[in-house]
Design a protein with these regions (language model features):
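Acidic, small-polar-rich N-terminal luminal/periplasmic segments of exported/outer-membrane proteins
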Residues: 40-185, 522
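Membrane-embedded beta-barrel scaffold of Gram-negative outer-membrane proteins
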Residues: 307-323, 327-333, 486, 513-594, ...
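Structural signature of Gram-negative outer-membrane beta-barrels, strongest in the C-terminal barrel
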Residues: 357, 376-388, 422-542, 572-574, ...
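Transmembrane beta-barrel wall of Gram-negative outer-membrane proteins
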Residues: 187-189, 194-268, 294-311, 362
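Surface-exposed loop/turn segments flanking beta-strands in extracellular/periplasmic regions
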Residues: 273-288, 339-346, 392-422, 506-510, ...
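Gram-negative outer-membrane beta-barrel transporters
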Residues: 539, 558-641, 677-680, 704-706
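C-terminal beta-signal and adjacent terminal beta-strands/loops
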Residues: 581, 624, 636-638, 658-707
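Face-selective signature of the C-terminal outer-membrane beta-barrel domain
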Residues: 304-327, 348-461, 535
């Protein structure tokens, strides 16, 4: 684990002034407990200058889109900010930071070693729809490591009304990654690790504060990964560097992040599509490869992200956000096997399909407060704009056959040299209006919001297509006691409108109105003693495009629907004096409705498990030794309109960390074993008739030096 997360772990500055009476009472109780044991941390632990709940895994303050930093216990949404400590403890060499996000019960991470992909409440998301420092669509599609990330905030459910306008869909929720900034204590950390197979990693994390009152900060995080992974014939080469410069003034804050990443995977991907089978073949050996070793794909990303806030007076703050993200599939060359028989036969088609995009985002607005009588108002007025140019093109290059249970070999083919042409240009302009009204000494809060945007889409060789829509946000919360808050909310999201393509449709070339997703949620947040629990009920209705027959022919329309209904329980805290816990569970009932001719109405959405959950634990044996464990469960799921069933699966990760010194240099040694049982299993992909193969058992060892 990174030593920098422990540098300020017991620094108790600046908490008392902000405490509620209940928190002050907790603090007095904690002080007595600390007198009895050095392991019992204060109610809000400061890790790297950031306050967390007991156990240090979840941060109390969440950066929630345009709302800014808010106490997560007061927000009328399901919001979780995973801390740097949790990210460093539970990220994996195979899936990076995505595996940490599965500590949030609404999130399920895929096992892909190459692609940022998760589901939130049953809806797929990739890097195109994720945020960095509040900038929409800025995350890479490639699987980046955690080294540069300070925290990750997950807002479950559609929430376009409180986030920056995003061209990519954020149906199930939003994920925002915050880059590391220089903290109060300077650090120089060097990390050396063995990631399994023949893969090794070297990293450095350096931060300094300087200038009058340490107002300026600089942080550089860089790493290199190279070597064959735990899967045979698959190799990963990765180079990343992120530079973060910030200024903290008396009336302004500025943050500038610059980033570069290049990731090359050799050996193809991990996914399988499913053909017309009557029985799902048993999962094969996950340590083997089922794609040609000469397949490869390369991701290259560059970022410039600027955030600035200026306090105009005691009640009004102006903000500006800017982002530039250039992304390239550097000669993308990939194939996905398709299962064609019950005996494990498959076909594979490899495509040479390079693509890339350039995204530019600009947002500005005012955030402030005022009072009308006894009612306090906190408002947001914001405007933003997205520009995207996408380049794409290529074609089918090679096809072959194989089997899951025998050794496969495919002769290599020459690679073409091809530059993808411009595919389309898109612009999206949006506005945000939010007013949070506080009554009864802030115990009762009402949030009203309205978001609208207009999209302009121009495909090469076609005329421009425009679409627009608005969506409201309503939320009501009541604090029954200082420790118990209940809320109800309604939120929405919508896409930019779908272009109808295909010669068989009578409305070919038409851009359909934006398809809306609507969520109703009821929840309660309870902070009692050493634990925080969040319970929530939700229903999400998503419009789908389906084929509709009319007297004059076939049309593609937004007349279909998917309905996801569920329950979540999330928790974080401590048991006794040494055991930190974080995790939760979700029940999800995802059904198809309003399908074509009603053929699949009431059937389960492919790949969605009814039950899933994760528990992460750290047991502090003594001040030097800690034991680490995580157990994940994914329930049975149906695919192919309930004609095939994917069995339930368990995954267990175990490890230990040891803090010591080499001379005067603090060193943290971490040993982890992932998928301890070594079980091979299929992982269903929510909303699709496809599968991921589990990651094989692997061992990693890391040493972090605090120089």
């Amino acid at each position: 684990m990174m030593g920098c997360s422990f540098g300020a772990a017991h620094d108790a500055f600046a908490e008392e002034a902000a405490k509620t009476p209940a928190e002050a009472e907790d603090s007095q109780r904690t002080a007595q407990e600390n007198a009895d044991s050095e392991y019992h941390l204060p109610d809000l632990t400061v890790l790297g200058d950031r306050k967390t709940f007991r156990g240090g895994m979840i941060e109390r303050k969440s950066a929630t889109g345009i709302l800014g930093g808010k106490d997560s216990l007061e927000l009328p949404f399901s919001v979780t900010t995973v801390s740097q400590k949790a990210i460093e403890t539970f990220s994996t060499p195979q899936s990076g930071v995505m595996d940490t996000l599965s500590l949030v019960p609404s999130v399920r991470a895929s096992s892909s070693k190459s692609v940022h992909s998760v589901t939130i409440r049953g809806f797929q998301q990739n890097g195109y729809s994720m945020y960095i420092n509040g900038i929409p669509g800025a995350m890479s599609s490639g699987n980046l490591p955690y080294y540069w990330i300070e925290n990750a905030t997950v807002v479950a459910g559609p929430n376009l009304g409180v986030n920056g306008t995003n061209i990519s869909d954020t149906i199930g929720g939003s994920i925002n990654f915050q880059s590391k900034r220089a903290q109060a204590k300077d650090n120089t950390d060097v990390r050396l690790s063995y990631n399994g197979g023949r893969s090794f990693e070297q990293g450095v994390d350096v931060s300094r504060r300087f200038g009058a009152d340490k107002a300026f900060g600089l942080r550089v995080a860089a790493n290199h990964i190279g070597g064959e992974t735990v899967q045979e014939d698959k190799e990963l080469k990765q180079d990343n560097i992120f530079v973060n410069f910030d200024h903290q003034g008396k009336r302004s804050t500025t943050n500038l992040m610059l980033g570069y990443s290049r990731i090359k995977y050799e050996g193809g991907g991990d996914g399988f599509s499913v053909g017309n089978l009557t029985v799902l073949p048993k999962a094969p050996d996950a340590s083997k490869s089922y794609t040609p070793s000469w397949l490869y794909h390369t991701y290259k990303d560059t970022w410039i992200i600027l955030n600035h806030e200026q306090k105009l007076n005691d009640h009004v703050t102006a903000y500006i956000n800017f982002g530039h993200h250039k992304f390239d599939y550097d000669k993308y060359y990939e194939g996905t096997p398709k299962l064609t028989s019950n005996d494990g036969d498959f076909t594979i088609n490899a495509e040479y399909w390079p693509l890339g995009h350039t995204r530019i985002y600009f947002g500005t607005g005012l955030r402030g407060d005022f009072q009308t009588g006894d009612v306090k108002h906190e408002y947001i007025i914001g405007f933003d704009k997205n520009w995207v140019n996408r380049f794409s093109g290529g074609g089918n290059l090679w096809s072959g056959t194989g089997n899951l249970y025998r050794n496969n070999s495919w002769a290599s083919v020459p690679l073409p040299d091809y530059q993808p042409p411009l595919q389309f240009k898109q612009q999206m302009t949006g506005y945000h209006l939010v007013d949070t009204m506080k009554f009864m000494d802030d115990r009762l809060q009402l949030t009203l919001g309205l978001h609208g945007h207009k999209s302009s889409y121009t495909r090469v060789g076609q005329k421009r297509q425009d679409s627009d829509a608005t969506c409201p946000t309503f939320a009501l919360s009541y604090k029954f006691t200082p420790e118990v808050m209940g809320y109800v909310s309604h939120s929405e999201s919508f896409n930019a409108g779908t272009l109808v393509s295909g010669a068989s449709y009578k409305n070919k070339g038409e851009v359909l109105p934006p398809a809306k997703t609507k969520q109703d949620e009821l929840g309660v947040k309870i902070k009692k003693g050493d634990f925080v629990n969040t319970l929530s009920l939700f229903k999400i209705r998503k419009a789908n495009t389906i084929d509709v027959m009319r007297p004059d022919g076939k049309y593609r329309l937004n007349d279909g629907e998917q309905e996801n209904t569920g329950f979540e329980w999330a928790f974080t805290g401590k048991i006794g004096k040494r055991l930190d816990l974080v995790g939760g569970m979700m029940y999800l009932d995802a059904k198809q409705s309003k399908t074509k001719d009603g053929a699949n109405d009431g059937k389960a959405v492919g790949g969605t498990s009814k039950f899933s959950g994760t528990i992460g634990a750290v047991y502090h044996v003594d001040p030097a030794w800690s034991l680490i464990g995580r157990v994940s469960y994914l329930g049975r799921a149906d695919i192919k309109n309930e004609t095939l069933s994917v069995p339930a699966s368990w995954k267990v990760d175990l490890g230990a960390s040891y803090e010591t010194k080499m001379g005067t240099t603090p060193v943290t040694l971490t040993l982890m074993c992932y998928n301890v049982t070594g079980k091979d299993y299929w992982i269903p992909v929510a909303g699709a008739d496809s599968l991921q193969l589990s990651a094989p058992r692997s061992v990693s060892f890391a040493a972090n030096f605090e120089l």
